[in-house]
Amino acid sequence: MSEVVQSVDPINFTEAASLKVKELIEEEGDNSLSLRVYITGGGCSGFQYAFAFDNEVKEDDMVITKNGVRLLVDSMSFQYLVGADVDYKDDVEGAYFVIRNPNAKTTCGCGSSFSV
């Protein structure tokens, strides 16, 4: 496990995202939970973003902590997410987590898949 403690994280876990995750963890009543962000094959552009709650920190995980909430990213996914923003939006389109990834060459219309 690598824990990021520098002032500028390689992945920006936004204030809005960390506070929403904190709220969801409190609703679950399990403070051992973290938000895992990972990349899988699929989607209309080749790669897809995925989110899951996890209470296990794996050896190759990058851990970014904000507002007492941990964001976990495995080493394979990390290479595609360096420089990205993990954010939470609540607007007229709905409420959802979103990733803004400067490494993505193309993204699909819904924003959940990308290519590099």
UniProtKB/Swiss-Prot annotation:
Cofactor section: iron-sulfur cluster
Source taxon at top rank: Bacteria
Tagged with keyword Iron: yes
The protein, known as: Iron-sulfur cluster insertion protein ErpA
GO BP terms, alphabetized: iron-sulfur cluster assembly
Subunit structure: Homodimer.
CC cofactor note: Binds 1 iron-sulfur cluster per subunit.
Physiological role: Required for insertion of 4Fe-4S clusters for at least IspG.
Matches recorded under Pfam families: Fe-S_biosyn
Family stated for the protein in its record: Belongs to the HesB/IscA family.
Gene Ontology molecular-function annotations: 2 iron, 2 sulfur cluster binding; 4 iron, 4 sulfur cluster binding; iron ion binding
Species of origin: Francisella tularensis subsp. holarctica (strain LVS)
Keywords: Iron, Iron-sulfur, Metal-binding
UniProt-annotated binding residues for iron-sulfur cluster: C44, C108, C110
